[in-house]
Amino acid sequence: MINKTAKNTKRLRRAERVRYKLRQTSERPRLVFNKTNRYLTAQIIDDAKGVTLVYATTLEKDFPKHENSKKSKSAATELGKVVADKAKKAGVSQVVLDRSGMVYHGRIAAFADSAREGGLEF
């Protein structure tokens, strides 16, 4: 059985390694996806200026209600659509996905696919 501490340490090391490489490409902002025990968040960050351009979360009042929860795969799909819409309004079309060291599977894949369908390129 895998120790949770070791699993989390490996994820954090992957996240730092990936973020270092992503910060080297300053021509595109980072699309950061994060999941907590209750909610999902996403933000687009311009590392050159150190500014958050777009922020969206399942905690917002205008976020569509889901029968399962605010951290489900369907909520991740809706969050991808919301982020893509806000990015269009902010004038952002190309981003780099920062998955915070997590495996590209499940909620992250659903979020990324719906953001691509919404018009973001990465």
Curated annotation (Swiss-Prot):
GO annotation terms (biological process): translation
UniProt GO molecular function: 5S rRNA binding; structural constituent of ribosome
Pfam family, one: Ribosomal_L18p
InterPro entries in UniProt: Ribosomal_uL18_bac-type, Ribosomal_uL18_bac/euk
Annotated signal sequence range: none
Keyword entries, A-Z: Ribonucleoprotein, Ribosomal protein, RNA-binding, rRNA-binding
Gene Ontology CC, one term: cytosolic large ribosomal subunit
Alphabetical list of CDD domains matching this protein: Ribosomal_L18_L5e
PANTHER family: 39S RIBOSOMAL PROTEIN L18, MITOCHONDRIAL, LARGE RIBOSOMAL SUBUNIT PROTEIN UL18M
Family designation: Belongs to the universal ribosomal protein uL18 family.
Subunit structure: Part of the 50S ribosomal subunit; part of the 5S rRNA/L5/L18/L25 subcomplex. Contacts the 5S and 23S rRNAs.
Biological function: This is one of the proteins that bind and probably mediate the attachment of the 5S RNA into the large ribosomal subunit, where it forms part of the central protuberance.
Protein name listed in UniProt: Large ribosomal subunit protein uL18
Protein's organism: Leptospira biflexa serovar Patoc (strain Patoc 1 / ATCC 23582 / Paris)
The gene coding this protein: rplR
